[in-house]
Regions:
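Flexible, active-site-adjacent loop/turn segments at secondary-structure boundaries
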Residues: 11, 90, 115
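Alpha-helix N-cap/helix-start and coil->helix boundary motif
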Residues: 10, 44-45, 103
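Short beta-strands and strand-loop turn motifs
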Residues: 8, 42, 78-79, 110-112
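Acidic, PIN/NYN-like endoribonuclease modules and their adjacent C-terminal/linker elements
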Residues: 2, 26, 70, 99-134
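Residue-level signal for well-ordered alpha-helical positions
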Residues: 16-17, 50, 87, 120-123
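PIN-domain endoribonuclease scaffold, especially VapC-family toxins
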Residues: 23-91, 95, 99
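Acidic active-site catalytic centers that drive phospho-/nucleotidyl reactions
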Residues: 6, 94, 113
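Short, well-structured N-terminal submotif of metal-dependent ribonuclease cores
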Residues: 1-39, 54-62, 119, 129-134
Length: 134
């Protein structure tokens, strides 16, 4: 099963944000064990920005390198952006991520922001909901 990990879940893990860290980390581990884990290309710059503030440039680059080695990067295509522009999703960034996930064949998006993914072409689950699936 292919699962896309949303930016906010990756930040919860990277920054060890409580009370979200544990379930986010467990959900990522479960997704990796179950198949392909995807990270949208748009997430990379956001992750770098926050990790740079915490770890400095070398640490941020090391973190991004680790992400690229552990996960498949979902490219942002023109079609993903066009679909997001025409979608009923209220948050454009989430729309781009959702359509990238769909175009890459993801089955699930793991996010803490399931409300903004209500009209996503891919089912969105919180880390806790994902942990409770078979």
């Amino acid at each position: 099963m292919s699962v896309l990990i949303d930016t906010n879940v990756m930040l919860d893990i990277a920054l060890k944000r409580e009370p979200f860290f544990q379930n986010s980390a467990l959900a990522l581990a479960k997704a990796r064990a179950a198949g392909d884990t995807l990270l949208c290309a748009t997430s990379i710059t956001t992750l770098h920005y926050f990790m740079h503030k915490k770890l400095g440039e070398a640490g941020a680059r090391r973190f991004i390198t680790d992400c690229l080695q552990a996960m498949t990067l979902a490219p942002v295509k023109r079609s993903s952006i066009q679909l997001a522009l025409g979608s009923d999703m209220h948050d454009f960034e989430d729309g781009v991520i959702a359509h990238c996930a769909a175009e890459c064949g993801a089955h699930i998006i793991i996010t803490r922001d399931t409300v903004d993914y209500a009209k996503s072409p891919i089912t969105a689950l919180t880390p806790t909901e994902y942990l409770n699936t078979q």
